[in-house]
Amino acid sequence: MIKRSEVWTVRYPRSGAEFGRALAFFDSGAVVALTLLAINVLNRPRHDYRPETWHQDFEGLLLLRNPAMVALIISFVFVGMFWLGHHLMVAHLVAIDRSFILANLVYLFFVTLAPVAAIAMAEHSKDPYAIGFYGAWLIALTVMQCVLAWLAGRRALFAPSVNGPTYVR
C-alpha cells in the first residue's frame, strides 16, 4: 500500500510498461493536435465544393492564399518543434513518476490547443486578441516544456550523465 505522501513519487523505470504507455500517450497527443490542424485547413463545408471551382480552391491552398493554410503551416512547425524538444528530453529519462505524468497532461492540454490557436489566427489575423491568444499559447507551451525539464531534473529522472555537473544550474 502506497502512503498518501508517496503517491507523486512512485517511479516507473524506462524498461517498464508504464513508461512505454506514458510515452505513447505523450506522442499521441501531438499526433492528434497535428491531425486536427490539417482538418481545419479548408473551413468550408464539403457541399460548397463545385467541380468547376474546386481547382481554384486547391490552387489557393498551394499558393498560400488561404489564411488557414498559412496558419496550418506555422502551427505545424511550432507543434513539431515542441514535440521534438519533448521527444529529445524524454530520450534522456531513466524513469518517470506521477508528478511528471501530471505535468505532461497539462503540457498536452496546451499542445491540443494548437487547432484553436491556428483557427483564431486564420479567421481573425488582424484582431489583437487572436494574436495575443496565439502568443499566449506559445508562451504556455514554452513554460510547460521548461517545467517538465525542471521537474525531471529535480526528481532525478534524467540519466546520470544528464544529472551530473553541467555548465547550467
Regions found by a protein language model. Name each.
Residues M1-R169:
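Multi-pass alpha-helical transmembrane bundle typical of ion/small-solute transporters
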